[in-house]
């Protein structure tokens, strides 16, 4: 089972296309939708949804995949549920770069302060990070510098921020899921 978390643009038709692409790895891909506007509510909602989905699968190695803001949640929700995660162009600092886009961006700081301290050290090796060199939204070198001590970093030379075509990364994601 693959749990897929969309980015900030929840209604993008690209989400459906990514789900179709991920079905080449696992036929059971489930979209977990969330508001993107209310971080504390989103966190509780996602924790409940993941817990529910885990009870409904017999997959011994489910993973959670998120793009952009979904990558922020995939890392945290994956850690809290003991799941491997794939972070595609993750938004590491929504409290800084979501100002004016969501109602309460400061809630992200509050979530970070309440999270398990040093969770990345405890989650080391359990996330795969895929970064676009052509990301038009984030400076992914900064993301790489932040995460490379904990997770494998894979660079993509072609895709933009929303990563519409996963094809070149599917074998890597599949190996990570099974490994």
Curated annotation (Swiss-Prot):
The lineage of its organism: Bacteria, Pseudomonadati, Pseudomonadota, Gammaproteobacteria, Alteromonadales. It comes from Shewanella woodyi (strain ATCC 51908 / MS32). Belongs to the UPF0227 family. Gene3D superfamilies: alpha/beta hydrolase. NCBIfam families: PRK04940.1. SUPFAM superfamilies: alpha/beta-Hydrolases. InterPro entries: AB_hydrolase_fold, UPF0227, UPF0227/Esterase_YqiA. This is UPF0227 protein Swoo_1808. It holds the Pfam family UPF0227. It comes from the Bacteria.
């Amino acid at each position: 089972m693959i749990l897929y978390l969309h980015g900030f643009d929840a209604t993008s038709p690209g989400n459906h296309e990514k789900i179709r692409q991920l079905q080449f790895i696992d036929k059971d891909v489930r979209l977990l939708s969330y508001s993107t506007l209310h971080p504390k509510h989103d966190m509780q909602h996602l924790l409940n949804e993941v817990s529910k989905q885990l009870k409904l699968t017999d997959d011994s190695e489910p993973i959670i995949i998120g793009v952009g803001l979904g990558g922020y949640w995939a890392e945290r929700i994956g850690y809290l549920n003991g799941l491997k995660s794939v972070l595609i162009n993750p938004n590491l600092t929504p409290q800084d770069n979501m100002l004016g886009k969501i109602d309460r961006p400061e809630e992200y700081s509050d979530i970070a302060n309440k999270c398990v301290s040093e969770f990345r050290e405890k989650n080391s090796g359990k996330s795969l990070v895929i970064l676009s060199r052509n990301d038009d939204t984030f400076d992914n070198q900064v993301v790489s510098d932040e995460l490379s001590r904990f997770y494998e970093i894979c660079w993509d030379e072609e895709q933009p921020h929303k990563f519409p075509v996963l094809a070149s990364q599917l074998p890597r994601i599949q190996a990570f899921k099974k490994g």
